[in-house]
Structures are given as C-alpha cells and as structure tokens.
UniProtKB/Swiss-Prot annotation:
Presence of the UniProt keyword Transmembrane helix in the record: no
Organism: Chlamydomonas reinhardtii (Chlamydomonas smithii)
TM helices/strands, residue ranges: none
Covalent link location (Glycyl lysine isopeptide (Gly-Lys) (interchain with K-? in acceptor proteins)): G90
Family: Belongs to the UFM1 family.
Function: Ubiquitin-like modifier protein which binds to a number of as yet unidentified target proteins.
Propeptide intervals in chain numbering: 91-96
Name of the protein: Ubiquitin-fold modifier 1
Keyword terms, alphabetized: Isopeptide bond, Ubl conjugation pathway
One of the GO BP terms on file: protein ufmylation
Amino acid sequence: MSQQAAAVTKVTFKVTLTSDPKLPFRVFSVPEEAPFTAVLKFAAEEFKVPAQTSAIITNDGVGINPQQIAGNVFLKHGSELRLIPRDRVGGISRAR
C-alpha cells in the first residue's frame, strides 16, 4: 500500500431512507474528495431506489446540492443525512 493511498482522508455519513416507515439507515465512509453525486448514487443503490429520482436532505429538511465534494457536504451539514425519492417530495396525500 503506498503512502499516498494511506493518506486519503475519509468522511462518514449515516443516510436514512425516509420513504420507508421503518427508517432504515446505512453508514458508509467515502474519500473526502469524492464527488457527492457518487455518494448519492451509492446510497440510492444501497436502498434499491433510483438515483436519478432521489435527493439527499439534512435532518432539518434542507436540500443538498450534489455538485460538490463529500468533504464540503460533511463540513456544512454534518454526517446524518436523509435519502428521499423525488416522487415523494411535495407529494399530497389525498384520502377519498
């Protein structure tokens, strides 16, 4: 293992799937320099939901722009995030 590979700094995220009533979560570590789009795709694959129609938000409900690196997201928003399929965003439940 090279010294350069050993020096890679990682950040750890706990991602919860909000569309499941049981609120399952996954914890994973990624390189600090990883594009957050890759984190979103990986999290979506872990929960078997389509990445193209999913978003990651904070526990406070703030949307996260995926066009940044994982380290910046970690510094701005912390480690606890939520994965939400976009078909659930702004949806209105109508009882008939």
